[in-house]
Amino acid sequence: MKADHMLEAILNGEINAGIAISGNARQGVLEMPLYTERFYVYLAESCWRKLPVFKPENLEHENMWIMKEAQCLRDSAFSFCKARGKGHHVYEAGSIETLIRIVDENGGYTIIPEMHLPFLTEKQAGNVREIQGDYLSQRRISLYIKDDYIRQRMLNTVADTLKRFVPARMMGEGIVKYGIKL
């Protein structure tokens, strides 16, 4: 479900809450940051640009494979979506795993979120590189609820579940210490 549809469903009472990339401000909806994850470069073995660490200026759009919307960074100076307007490799649907296979077969590189790193094989993990710069190479994930929502216990159950599989260093400090307070 796209973020705007999710927010509409929250406002209409069709769903209680939703999780999406932060920055989807809407009147009547509260946003609670949950965790922040970094992005990494995933390179094909044949990629000529095997730098140990990447800077945004090293990421040329010609060889980049991106998904239609999933890798966009809202309000960022370094947007993976800029390549879309240049007519390069834009993968229309699927998953990060499929995108990695496309890179492995066709060359080039893509951007993958930190939460996907544990799913890589040892060989694939060798093709991952860091991107320098905190703001430019990360995204914040938030929980969205209607502003009059009162089920604090349910929200804390969601937060507690996330704490079990999201590394503590990625979780928001307030969520870790205090949980969600309405």
Give names to the regions the model predicted:
Residues M1, I15-I21, G94, I111-P113, ...:
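Short beta-strand and adjacent tight-turn residues that come in two discontinuous sequence segments
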